[in-house]
């Protein structure tokens, strides 16, 4: 049974977390956290998402807070995430012991020359690391093929994530690269923001599925999608707080994820709980209890709190 708005909001804390670096064009991360009977849950769809899409994020928060996450334990290998910045070395210092990195490319303010410079710097500083790049749907097919060939001259990539917008375009990029550099393709938005998340597998459009708990509606739903896709998987954060990271770690453990994109707490100046330690490039699957003092210090103003409360009400209509 879906909880009511009153059930959720009576347990809610709205927080604003300052970012250490600009990421996805934002400098603060807002989230509504739910202190539920089964644990803490998170509702933090990006502000531009309409209620129909954001509702999956609410379902994920409800799963964690009211139903409870599936049982999992142990350790998960993680990747470091490098924004589009010239100060690559400073960001690397946030990820001690990590041997896989995801580099953001194709940002609106950046050129392919910029991307190549950042990739070259990263590869020079971490020559033995596995490197994946993420274009967030920015390229045409021709641009993606050009970039893949340029990147291949710097180093072999683990994969290029979501180079183009549609599954059909990903399939064409993959076909054109197969006889040349053969760089693998990963799908993210073509799974989590698509009407048919299984189209990428049907078209042979990807080698790897990048799956995020909140946009897919929770750990249970993510595991179902992964099983049906039949692809290798990388579980990643949707820029989650420490609370949302719990679900990501559980999902990564249950699905046998490649190095998971779950070390993103290090992109925040402050979070509601201390960053999980990364030990030899891995993080432990544990549950987080936010620090009451941090919840108070990071609480949103009344206007933003009310905005998030209304967003919960709007999204409940789609569950």
Residue ranges of model-derived segments:
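N-terminal capping/lid subdomain adjacent to the active-site entrance of alpha/beta enzymes
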Residues: 1-154, 179-180, 273-319
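Solvent-exposed, charged interface segments at domain starts and junctions
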Residues: 2-14, 176-209
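Residue-level detector of flexible, active-site-proximal loop/helix-junction positions
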Residues: 21, 85, 192, 240, ...
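Shared catalytic-loop signature of beta/alpha-barrel
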Residues: 60-61, 195-294, 303
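Glycine-enriched alpha-helix->loop->beta-strand junction motifs that scaffold or abut catalytic
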Residues: 96-99, 126-128, 149-157, 174-185, ...
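Catalytic beta/alpha-barrel core
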Residues: 100-111, 130-137, 155-167, 182-193, ...
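Active-site-adjacent beta->alpha loops and helix N-cap segments on the catalytic face
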Residues: 107-125, 139-143, 163-177, 194-196, ...
């Amino acid at each position: 049974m879906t909880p009511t708005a009153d059930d959720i909001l009576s347990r809610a804390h709205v927080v604003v977390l300052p970012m250490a670096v600009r990421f996805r064009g934002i400098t603060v991360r807002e989230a509504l956290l739910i202190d539920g009977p089964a644990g803490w849950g998170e509702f933090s769809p990006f502000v531009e998402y309409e209620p129909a899409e954001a509702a999956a994020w609410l379902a994920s928060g409800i799963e964690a807070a009211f139903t409870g996450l599936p049982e999992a334990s142990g350790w998960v290998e993680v990747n470091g995430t490098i924004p589009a910045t010239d100060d690559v070395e400073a960001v690397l210092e946030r990820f001690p012991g990590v041997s896989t990195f995801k580099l953001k490319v194709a940002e609106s303010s950046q050129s392919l020359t910029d991307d190549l410079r950042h990739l070259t710097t990263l590869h020079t500083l971490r020559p033995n690391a596995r490197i994946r790049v993420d274009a967030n749907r920015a390229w045409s097919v021709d641009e993606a093929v050009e970039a893949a060939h340029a990147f291949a001259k710097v180093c072999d990539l683990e994969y290029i994530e979501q180079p183009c917008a549609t599954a059909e375009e990903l399939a064409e990029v993959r076909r054109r690269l197969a006889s040349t550099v053969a760089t693998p393709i990963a799908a993210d938005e073509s799974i989590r923001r698509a009407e048919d998340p299984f189209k990428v597998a049907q078209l042979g459009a990807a080698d790897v599925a990048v799956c995020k708990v909140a946009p897919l509606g929770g750990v249970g739903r993510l595991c179902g999608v992964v099983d049906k896709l039949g692809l290798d998987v990388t579980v990643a954060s949707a820029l989650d707080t420490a609370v949302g990271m719990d679900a990501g770690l559980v999902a990564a453990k249950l699905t046998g994820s490649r190095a998971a994109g779950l070390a993103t707490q290090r992109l925040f100046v402050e979070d509601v709980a201390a960053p999980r330690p990364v030990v030899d490039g891995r993080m432990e699957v544990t549950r987080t209890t936010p620090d009451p003092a941090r919840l108070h210090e990071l609480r949103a103003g009344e206007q933003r709190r009310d905005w998030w409360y209304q967003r919960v009400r709007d999204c409940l209509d789609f569950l």
